[in-house]
UniProtKB/Swiss-Prot annotation:
It comes from Porcine transmissible gastroenteritis coronavirus (strain Purdue) (TGEV). The KxHxx motif seems to function as an ER retrieval signal. Residues 655-799 are annotated as: Interaction with host ANPEP. The gene is S. This is Spike glycoprotein. Belongs to the alphacoronaviruses spike protein family. Residues 1-28 form the signal peptide. S1 region attaches the virion to the cell membrane by interacting with host ANPEP/aminopeptidase N, initiating the infection. Binding to the receptor probably induces conformational changes in the S glycoprotein unmasking the fusion peptide of S2 region and activating membranes fusion. S2 region belongs to the class I viral fusion protein. Under the current model, the protein has at least 3 conformational states: pre-fusion native state, pre-hairpin intermediate state, and post-fusion hairpin state. Keywords: Coiled coil, Glycoprotein, Host membrane, Host-virus interaction, Membrane, Signal, Transmembrane, Transmembrane helix, Viral attachment to host cell, Viral envelope protein, Virion, Virulence, Virus entry into host cell. InterPro entries: ALPHA_CORONA_SPIKE, CoV_S1_C, S2_sf_CoV, Spike_S1_CoV, Spike_S2_CoV, Spike_S2_CoV_C, Spike_S2_CoV_HR1, Spike_S2_CoV_HR2. Homotrimer. During virus morphogenesis, found in a complex with M and HE proteins. Interacts with host ANPEP. Pfam families: CoV_S1, CoV_S1_C, CoV_S2, CoV_S2_C. Its main location: virion.
Length: 1447
C-alpha cells in the first residue's frame, strides 16, 4: 500500500464564491461518520490481526461537506484548487429516476489527467467510468459517453458500477475518492481501491461538471444529491484490531509521532511500503552510504514490533533467544532474531533520562561488557556515564568496561543519537555505524529512562533479509524486499518502479547442493597434520587483554625436525588445536584464560592465495610444506588471538607450495586404491573436477573424444570432462541460464527462456523456433504445442517490443512482422535522351548494412556467473549493470523501430518477384508476346538477380544463395536452434553455448534474411508494376528493365540493334559477377585488385557479419582474464580463500569485467550509430536507384545510371547498379550565352535549359549539346531566354566576409600556412655523427619462404580471376554513331546535268502517253470511226420492267 497513514483535510469555511450553484448547503450530513468509519474499516481490512495503529493520510474528514444543486445546464461547472484529495457521496433518501444526477469529476495534471464520469444508470454494472490518460479532459460530458476518447496512452480505463452489487439499495454507504501523488494515484470506487504508479505533475485543481437532474423544476426541489468533501491536509485515525474486532476512532495524542514511528507488521514480517522509516539507518561495517540505492542484506524482516510509550526506572532486558512477543503490533514471526533495533522519536533537544545510562552486553561465556559515554575523556568518571538519545549538549567519550575497568576506547558519541541496533553476533551500531564488535551476544540490558520528556520508543526484533534500500542523507527512506519474482527484477535493476519492457531474470541462489568430485583413480595415502597453537594472554596496565608474541606453534615432527613439515602422501587433512594460558605480570603462562582474557586462535589468510580453512576442501598441489621459518617460503598465514574486544596477530605460519594435482587436501581419510570420484548427474551440484570448481549440472553425453581430460571454453569455464576409467564424456552446464522477463505495469506477464520448465510462477507456455515462452496467457491445449508460433497466434496489440518480439498486456506473445503495403505504382518516364559515341555498360556491386543483430547481456550472469556472494558484491556498483543492460536494450529498440518502419512489402509486387512469374508466357498480353522472356536472349543475366520460388527458401535469387552460403560467421551465436540446443546439456558446449552460459544472448532481429529477401523481391516486383504504365503480371520483367534502357535516349533508327548489344553486354557482366561471387571469397584475405567492386562488397559483407561476432568472442575471452586476481574463476577463488580475502580478489574481477562490458557497449552503440546512418543511405538508394532512375552521377554506381536491383545480403542489402561509363569525349569550347547589339540597344541571350551547353564547332558555327552525352544540334530561338544586358555584377567582399556569404568556405592555403606557423619548431637540429654504426643481422629466411608461398598462392588465384576480369571488360559496347550535324551544301555540275537530261527525256514521253491514250485521245478517235463504218447498228431486246418495292 502506498499511503498507510491517512491524511484528513480541514477546509476553510467559506466557499460561496467557488460554488456557482443554484443552491449551496454547508452542513454536517447525518451519516458522515458512518461513511468515514465504513471507509476506514474497508481500508484497514488488510491489516493483520492484533494491530493497533494510527493511520495518517489524505482521508475524508468529519467536516466540511458540501452539497451543490445546479440548474439544468451543461455550461457551468465548479472548480476547486490546491486539493490533495477529494471524496464524494450520493444521497439516496427520497430519490426517483428524475431526481438522479450525473456527475463528471476532472483532476487536472500533466501529462496525465483524471476523469470520473457517473451516469444515471445506478443499477448497471457499468454505470460509471474512470480514465487516467494523457490529454486535455472535457469539463462536461454526456450520459452516453462512457469512453476515454478524450485522451491517449491511458494508464487506467475502467468501467465500474455506481452502487455496490449493482443495487440502488446499497448506495449511500460507500464513498468515492481520489488521491494523487507525484508517483501514484489512488482511486476508491464502489468499495474497491486502485493504485496506479507513474510519474506525473498535478495542479491540485478539480472540476465538477454535469451536476444536474433531469429537469430544472426537479433540481430546484432537491436537497441531498451529490455531497463533496475536499481534502487539503493530513488527518489521523486510530485503528485497533484486537480479538477479531476492529475499532476506528479519532487520534488526538502524538498522532504524527505515532504515524512516523509505528507501523503494523505485515504478514511475513514485512514493513509496509508507505512507512516513512523515520530514524531507521542502513547498518554498515565500513563506509556509510550518503544517498543512493543498493541491494543489501539488512535486518528489515520484523519478527515483532513493540511500541513503547516510555520505560520504567528499572533496567530492562532483551534477549535474542526466547524473547516474548506478547505486545507485538501486527504480524508475529518465529524466525531467529538477528538484530534488535531501538528507535526513538524525540521532540526536544536533549532526551537523556534520569540516572545512569549504560548498555550491558551479555556475551557468550558469561562475560558482561558495559558501554557508556562520558562528558570528559577520563574514563575514571564512568559512574556518571550515559548514552543520551537526541541532540547531546557536548562531546561524549565512549568506553567498553568489564568489572569497572575500561577495556577499550570506542570513540566519540555522535552529536545526535536516533537509533541503536545490536546484533546477536556482537555488533553494536549507533545511527547505522558499527561502533563496536565483540563475541556473540545473548541478551541486552540497560537502565535508560525517558524522563518527563515527550518521547516515543519502538523496539523491533528483526532478521536479515535481502532488500533494495533507498538512502537519503544516510537514513533509509524506502525499502523493496527481494522476496518475489518481480521484486527480484526490481532488485537486479536497482529500481522500485519497473517500466514496461524486457528484463533479465536474476539467477536464483543455489542452496545446499550435493558435492561432486572427479579425481584420477589411484592408490591414495593419507596424512593428518595436527597443528597446536598455545596462546599466552595477560593484562595491560589499564586492564585490557594482550596476546603475547611468545605464543607458540607446534608442527608434527618429521625427520627429527619440528620447524618444517612437508606432505609426502597423496592426500592430507589439516587440523588446528588451540590452547590458552594466562599470566599476571610475568611471561609465565600457567593459569587458565578466564573472563576477558579468554581467547581463541584463528589462522588468517595472510599473503597466501588460499585460506587455511579451505585446505581440506580438495585443494590440489604438487608440493605443500608448512614452516615456522620464512626461509624459502612462498607465502604466510597470520596466526591471531581473538578476544572479546579485538584480534591480535601473534605469529606467522609459512607455506612452501607448488601448484599441481599430485597432492589433494581432503576432509577425511580415503587411503587405499580408490576412484574417489562422486558424481551427481542431472541435478545442480557443487563440483570439483580435476581441480576445476564451480556449480552446474553434469550430464552424460554420447560424444567420443580421444584426447583430453577436461575441456574449457575461451572464457575458461568448464564445458565437459572425461572419465578416464570408461572414456565417457560428461557435459557441464549452468544450473540456470539467463531468461528475459516481460514486465507490463509492474507485473511479470511472460518470460523467454531456453529451458522447457516452469519459471517465475508462469505455467502456460508455447514454443518458437528459437526459445520457449512462458506466460500468464492461457495457451489452451487444443492448440498444437511444440510447433511454430503461428499455431498460437493471438490478435492483440503488443505493449512492449524487443527485436522482432512483442508481448501484449494479457501476456500473449506475438512476432512483429514486416509492414505490408499495397504499394503505390510509380510509372517510369518515357522521354528520350541522346547516347554517347562510345561507352561501357557496367554492373557495379555495392553493399550497405541495414541492421545489426540485437544482443542482450545479463550483466550479473556475465560478471558473476551465478555466484551469490559475487552478486552481493556487484550491488555495491549501484547502477552499473542497469546502465549496461538498458543501453543495449534501448539501442536495440530504437534500431528495431527504424528497421520496422523501413521494411514494407507489397503483396502484388511480391507475386511478380520471381523468375518463374517473369518467364511465364501464359500471363502475358498478346501485344507483348513477341518479346523474349528472361530465359531467352533478351536479358538473361537477370535470372541470377531475380528471386526464385522454392520449397525451402522462398524469394531468394541465385546470388543471394551464394552470399548467404559464402559468408562465414565467426564467434556470433545464431538464433536458429542454438539457444535451446545449448541448454540440453547432452553435448559439449561450443563458443555459442559459452556465450549463452555467460549471459550473452543473441536475439532474432526485426529484419532477418527472409524478410530482407521479401523486401528486395518486392522492390523488383514494384519495377514491373511501374513499367510502361504497369499492368499486373501482364508485363515481363525484361520489358520493365528495357523501359529504363529506352530512357537513355537510344535513337529509333538503331533501337533494335542497340538494345540487343546492351542486353548481350549486361548478360555477360552479370554472368561473370555471379561466378566471381563464388570464387572471390577465397581471395579476399589476399591482395587482389581484380574484380574490385565485387571483392570490396563481399569483403564488407564478411566484415559486417563478423565484427559483432568478433566483439562477442572478445567479450567472452575476457572472462578468462584474471585482471590481477589469483584466478579467473570466481568459484575457485571462494574455494581457496576465506570470504574477506576472496571478496577483495573477486572485486578485481568485477571491475575488470564491468570495464570489458562497458567497452563492448560503447562499441555496440557506436556501431549502431554507424548502421543508422548506413540504413538511411540504403533508403535513399532504394528510392533513387531502384524505384527510379538517378540523375546524379556517382550516387547509383560510378557512371550514368540506367537501373538498379537490390538483393538481400547478411545484415543488409547488396545493390547491382547498371551504369554507362563513357570511354571517349568530345572537347568543345562552351559559351555561357550570346551578347547582341542593335544600334544603341544591347541585350543578352542565355540557354534556357541548364543541361544544355552552347559551343562553337570547327566550322565556326554554334550548336547545342546535352552535357551528359555529346549530341550537337542547331539551336533554335526556343532554346534561349533574353536578358536585359550583358554586364556581369560581382559582390565586393573581403576574405573575412566570405564565411557570412558562403558558410562552408575555408581558405585551405591559409589554414595550412597557419598550422605550419603554429607548429614551427623552436629548436635546432643536433649534428649527429655516424662514426660507429651497430648493425644487427636479422634472419628472415623462414618469413621470406612463407611470403613466397603465399605469393604463389595469390598468383594462382589472380590468374583465375583475371579470366573473369577479361570477361567483364569485354562488355564494351560500341554503338553506331548517332551524332548528326544538320548543314546545307551545293550539288556538283554533273548532278545538275543529269537532272536536265532526265527532264528532257521524260517530258516528251509523258506528253505522248497523255495525248495518245484514253477515249479523247487521237488513237481512240480513229478506232471508233473505223468500227462504225464496218459494222451495222444492232439493238438489244428489252424485257418489260416491273416496279419493285424494296423493304
Amino acid at each position: 500500500m502506498k499511503k498507510l497513514f491517512v491524511v484528513l483535510v480541514v477546509m476553510p469555511l467559506i466557499y460561496g464564491d467557488n460554488f456557482p450553484c443554484s443552491k449551496l448547503t454547508n452542513r454536517t450530513i447525518g451519516n458522515q461518520w458512518n461513511l468515514i468509519e465504513t471507509f476506514l474499516l474497508n481500508y484497514s481490512s488488510r491489516l493483520p490481526p492484533n494491530s493497533d495503529v494510527v493511520l495518517g493520510d489524505y482521508f475524508p474528514t468529519v467536516q466540511p461537506w458540501f452539497n451543490c444543486i445546479r440548474n439544468n445546464s451543461n455550461d457551468l461547472y465548479v472548480t476547486l484548487e490546491n486539493l490533495k484529495a477529494l471524496y464524494w457521496d450520493y444521497a439516496t433518501e427520497n430519490i426517483t429516476w428524475n431526481h438522479r444526477q450525473r456527475l463528471n469529476v476532472v483532476v487536472n495534471g500533466y501529462p496525465y489527467s483524471i476523469t470520473v464520469t457517473t451516469t444515471r444508470n445506478f443499477n448497471s454494472a457499468e454505470g460509471a467510468i474512470i480514465c487516467i490518460c494523457k490529454g486535455s479532459p472535457p469539463t462536461t460530458t454526456t450520459e452516453s459517453s462512457l469512453t476515454c476518447n478524450w485522451g491517449s496512452e491511458c494508464r487506467l480505463n475502467h468501467k465500474f458500477p455506481i452502487c455496490p452489487s449493482n443495487s440502488e439499495a446499497n448506495c449511500g454507504n460507500m464513498l468515492y475518492g481520489l488521491q494523487w501523488f507525484a508517483d501514484e494515484v489512488v482511486a476508491y470506487l464502489h468499495g474497491a481501491s486502485y493504485r496506479i504508479s507513474f510519474e506525473n505533475q498535478w495542479s491540485g485543481t478539480v472540476t465538477f461538471g454535469d451536476m444536474r437532474a433531469t429537469t430544472l423544476e426537479v433540481a430546484g426541489t432537491l436537497v441531498d444529491l451529490w455531497w463533496f468533501n475536499p481534502v487539503y491536509d493530513v488527518s489521523y485515525y486510530r485503528v485497533n484490531n484486537k480479538n477479531g474486532t476492529t475499532v476506528v476512532s479519532n487520534c488526538t495524542d502524538q498522532c504524527a509521532s505515532y504515524v512516523a514511528n509505528v507501523f503494523t507488521t505485515q504478514p511475513g514480517g514485512f514493513i509496509p511500503s508507505d512507512f516513512s522509516f523515520n530514524n531507521w539507518f542502513l547498518l554498515t561495517n565500513s563506509s556509510t552510504l550518503v544517498s543512493g540505492k543498493l541491494v543489501t542484506k539488512q535486518p528489515l524482516l520484523v519478527n515483532c514490533l513493540w511500541p513503547v510509550p516510555s520505560f520504567e526506572e528499572a533496567a530492562s532486558t532483551f534477549c535474542f533467544e526466547g524473547a516474548g512477543f506478547d505486545q507485538c503490533n501486527g504480524a508475529v514471526l518465529n524466525n531467529t532474531v538477528d538484530v534488535i533495533r531501538f528507535n526513538l522519536n524525540f521532540t526536544t533537544n536533549v532526551q537523556s533520562g534520569k540516572g545512569a545510562t549504560v548498555f550491558s552486553l551479555n556475551t557468550t561465556g558469561g562475560v558482561t561488557l558495559e558501554i557508556s559515554c562520558y562528558t570528559v575523556s577520563d574514563s575514571s568518571f564512568f559512574s556518571y556515564g550515559e548514552i543520551p538519545f537526541g541532540v547531546t549538549d557536548g562531546p561524549r567519550y565512549c568506553y567498553v568496561h568489564y568489572n569497572g575497568t575500561a577495556l577499550k576506547y570506542l570513540g566519540t558519541l555522535p552529536p545526535s543519537v536516533k537509533e541503536i541496533a545490536i546484533s546477536k553476533w556482537g555488533h553494536f551500531y549507533i545511527n547505522g555505524y558499527n561502533f563496536f564488535s565483540t563475541f556473540p551476544i545473548d541478551c541486552i540490558s540497560f537502565n535508560l529512562t525517558t524522563g518527563d520528556s515527550d518521547v516515543f520508543w519502538t523496539i523491533a526484533y528483526t532478521s536479515y533479509t535481502e532488500a533494495l534500500v533507498q538512502v537519503e542523507n544516510t537514513a533509509i527512506t524506502k525499502v523493496t524486499y527481494c522476496n518475489s519474482h518481480v521484486n527480484n527484477i526490481k532488485c537486479s535493476q536497482i529500481t522500485a518502479n519497473l517500466n514496461n519492457g524486457f528484463y533479465p531474470v536474476s539467477s536464483s541462489e543455489v542452496g545446499l547442493v550435493n558435492k561432486s568430485v572427479v579425481l584420477l583413480p589411484s592408490f591414495y595415502t593419507h596424512t593428518i597434520v595436527n597443528i597446536t597453537i598455545g596462546l599466552g594472554m595477560k593484562r595491560s596496565g589499564y586492564g585490557q587483554p594482550i596476546a603475547s608474541t611468545l605464543s607458540n606453534i607446534t608442527l608434527p615432527m618429521q625427520d627429527h625436525n619440528t620447524d618444517v613439515y612437508c606432505i609426502r602422501s597423496d592426500q592430507f587433512s589439516v587440523y588446528v588445536h588451540s590452547t590458552c594460558k594466562s599470566a599476571l605480570w610475568d611471561n609465565i603462562f600457567k593459569r587458565n584464560c578466564t573472563d576477558v582474557l579468554d581467547a581463541t586462535a584463528v589462522i588468517k589468510t595472510g599473503t597466501c592465495p588460499f585460506s587455511f580453512d579451505k585446505l581440506n576442501n580438495y585443494l590440489t598441489f604438487n608440493k605443500f610444506c608448512l614452516s615456522l621459518s620464512p626461509v624459502g617460503a612462498n607465502c604466510k598465514f597470520d596466526v591471531a588471538a581473538r578476544t572479546r574486544t579485538n584480534e591480535q596477530v601473534v605469529r606467522s605460519l609459512y607455506v612452501i607450495y607448488e601448484e599441481g594435482d599430485n597432492i589433494v587436501g581432503v576432509p577425511s581419510d580415503n587411503s587405499g586404491v580408490h576412484d574417489l570420484s562422486v558424481l551427481h548427474l542431472d541435478s545442480c551440484t557443487d563440483y570439483n573436477i580435476y581441480g576445476r570448481t564451480g556449480v552446474g549440472i553434469i550430464r552424460q553425453t554420447n560424444r567420443t573424444l580421444l584426447s583430453g581430460l577436461y575441456y574449457t571454453s575461451l572464457s575458461g569455464d568448464l564445458l565437459g570432462f572425461k572419465n578416464v576409467s570408461d572414456g565417457v564424456i560428461y557435459s557441464v552446464t549452468p544450473c540456470d541460464v539467463s531468461a528475459q522477463a516481460a514486465v507490463i505495469d509492474g507485473t511479470i506477464v511472460g518470460a523467454i527462456t531456453s529451458i522447457n520448465s516452469e519459471l517465475l510462477g508462469l505455467t502456460h507456455w508455447t514454443t518458437t523456433p528459437n526459445f520457449y515462452y512462458y506466460s500468464i496467457y492461457n495457451y489452451t491445449n487444443d492448440r498444437t504445442r511444440g510447433t511454430a508460433i503461428d499455431s498460437n497466434d493471438v490478435d492483440c496489440e503488443p505493449v512492449i517490443t524487443y527485436s522482432n518480439i512483442g508481448v501484449c498486456k494479457n501476456g500473449a506473445f506475438v512476432f512483429i512482422n514486416v509492414t505490408h503495403s499495397d504499394g503505390d505504382v510509380q510509372p517510369i518516364s518515357t522521354g528520350n535522351v541522346t547516347i554517347p559515341t562510345n561507352f561501357t555498360i557496367s554492373v557495379q556491386v555495392e553493399y550497405i548494412q541495414v541492421y545489426t543483430t540485437p544482443v542482450s547481456i545479463d550483466c550479473s550472469r556475465y560478471v558473476c556467473n551465478g555466484n551469490p556472494r559475487c552478486n552481493k558484491l556487484l550491488t555495491q556498483y549501484v547502477s552499473a549493470c542497469q546502465t549496461i543492460e538498458q543501453a543495449l536494450a534501448m539501442g536495440a529498440r530504437l534500431e528495431n523501430m527504424e528497421v520496422d518502419s523501413m521494411l514494407f512489402v507489397s503483396e502484388n509486387a511480391l507475386k511478380l518477384a520471381s523468375v518463374e512469374a517473369f518467364n511465364s508466357s501464359e500471363t502475358l498480353d498478346p501485344i507483348y508476346k513477341e518479346w523474349p522472356n528472361i530465359g531467352g536472349s533478351w536479358l538473361e543475366g537477370l535470372k541470377y538477380i531475380l528471386p526464385s520460388h522454392n520449397s525451402k527458401r522462398k524469394y531468394r535469387s541465385a546470388i543471394e544463395d551464394l552470399l548467404f552460403d559464402k559468408v562465414v560467421t565467426s564467434g556470433l551465436g545464431t538464433v536458429d536452434e542454438d539457444y535451446k540446443r545449448c541448454t540440453g546439456g547432452y553435448d559439449i558446449a561450443d563458443l555459442v553455448c559459452a556465450q549463452y552460459y555467460n549471459g550473452i544472448m543473441v536475439l532474432p532481429g526485426v529484419a532477418n534474411a527472409d524478410k530482407m529477401t521479401m523486401y528486395t523481391a518486392s522492390l523488383a516486383g514494384g519495377i514491373t508494376l511501374g513499367a510502361l504504365g504497369g499492368g499486373a503480371v501482364a508485363i515481363p520483367f525484361a520489358v520493365a528493365v528495357q523501359a529504363r534502357l529506352n530512357y537513355v535516349a537510344l535513337q529509333t533508327d538503331v533501337l533494335n540493334k542497340n538494345q540487343q548489344i546492351l542486353a548481350s553486354a549486361f548478360n555477360q557482366a552479370i554472368g561473370n559477377i555471379t561466378q566471381s561471387f563464388g570464387k572471390v571469397n577465397d581471395a579476399i584475405h589476399q591482395t587482389s585488385r581484380g574484380l574490385a567492386t565485387v571483392a570490396k562488397a563481399l569483403a564488407k559483407v564478411q566484415d559486417v557479419v563478423n565484427i559483432q561476432g568478433q566483439a562477442l568472442s572478445h567479450l567472452t575471452v575476457q572472462l578468462q582474464n584474471n585482471f590481477q586476481a589469483i584466478s579467473s574463476s570466481i568459484s575457485d577463488i571462494y574455494n581457496r580463500l576465506d570470504e574477506l580475502s576472496a571478496d577483495a580478489q573477486v572485486d578485481r574481477l568485477i571491475t575488470g569485467r564491468l570495464t570489458a562490458l562497458n567497452a563492448f557497449v560503447s562499441q555496440t552503440l557506436t556501431r549502431q550509430a554507424e548502421v543508422r546512418a548506413s540504413r538511411q543511405l540504403a533508403k535513399d538508394k532504394v528510392n533513387e536507384c531502384v524505384r527510379s532512375q538517378s540523375q546524379r552521377f556517382g550516387f547509383c554506381g560510378n557512371g550514368t545510371h540506367l537501373f538498379s536491383l537490390a538483393n538481400a545480403a547478411p545484415n543488409g542489402m547488396i545493390f547491382f547498379h547498371t551504369v554507362l561509363l563513357p570511354t571517349a569525349y568530345e572537347t568543345v569550347t562552351a559559351w555561357p550565352g550570346i551578347c547582341a547589339s542593335d544600334g544603341d540597344r544591347t541585350f543578352g541571350l542565355v540557354v534556357k535549359d541548364v543541361q544544355l551547353t552552347l559551343f562553337r564547332n570547327l566550322d565556326d558555327k554554334f550548336y547545342l549539346t546535352p552535357r551528359t552525352m555529346y549530341q550537337p544540334r542547331v539551336a533554335t530561338s526556343s532554346d534561349f531566354v533574353q536578358i536585359e544586358g550583358c554586364d556581369v555584377l560581382f559582390v565586393n567582399a573581403t576574405v573575412s566576409d566570405l564565411p557570412s556569404i558562403i558558410p562552408d568556405y575555408i581558405d585551405i592555403n591559409q589554414t595550412v600556412q597557419d598550422i605550419l606557423e603554429n607548429f614551427r619548431p623552436n629548436w635546432t637540429v643536433p649534428e649527429l655523427t655516424f662514426d660507429i654504426f651497430n648493425a644487427t643481422y636479422l634472419n628472415l629466411t623462414g618469413e621470406i619462404d612463407d611470403l613466397e608461398f603465399r605469393s604463389e598462392k595469390l598468383h594462382n588465384t589472380t590468374v583465375e580471376l583475371a579470366i573473369l576480369i577479361d570477361n567483364i571488360n569485354n562488355t564494351l559496347v560500341n554503338l553506331e554513331w548517332l551524332n548528326r550535324i544538320e548543314t546545307y551544301v551545293k550539288w556538283p555540275w554533273y548532278v545538275w546535268l543529269l537532272i536536265g537530261l532526265v527532264v528532257i527525256f521524260c517530258i516528251p514521253l509523258l506528253l505522248f502517253c497523255c495525248c495518245s491514250t484514253g477515249c479523247c485521245g487521237c488513237i481512240g478517235c480513229l478506232g471508233s470511226c473505223c468500227h462504225s463504218i464496218c459494222s451495222r447498228r444492232q439493238f438489244e431486246n428489252y424485257e418489260p420492267i416491273e416496279k419493285v418495292h424494296v423493304h
